[in-house]
Amino acid sequence: MLIKVKTLTGKEIELDIDPNDKVSRIKERVEEKEGIPPSQQRLIYAGKQMADDKNAESYHLEGGSVLHLVLALRGGSC
């Protein structure tokens, strides 16, 4: 099924995924297209952060679903 991942810059990345794909696999696909390491990615769907060990089906993703990509940048202490 075809889903979209929307970045904070408004760019939309189209991905063809399987309902059994884990969120970690979706993050790997985003890395292939955008070069962002999965460890820095946070995927949000329906207002909730998606867990790496769950699959697309468990979040009720359908063709045309839009995920939001937020970057989790590691910072030092202030």
Curated annotation (Swiss-Prot):
Any Gene Ontology CC annotation: cytoplasm
Family according to the record: Belongs to the ubiquitin family.
The name this protein goes by in its record: Ubiquitin-like protein 1
Organism: Schizosaccharomyces pombe (strain 972 / ATCC 24843) (Fission yeast)
SMART domains: UBQ (SM00213)
Record keywords, A-Z: Ubl conjugation pathway
Gene3D superfamilies: Phosphatidylinositol 3-kinase Catalytic Subunit, Chain A, domain 1
Family matches, as PANTHER family: UBIQUITIN
Name of the gene encoding the protein in the UniProt record: ubl1
Keyword Transferase: no
Pfam families, alphabetized: ubiquitin
Cytoplasm in keyword set: no
GO molecular function: protein tag activity; ubiquitin protein ligase binding
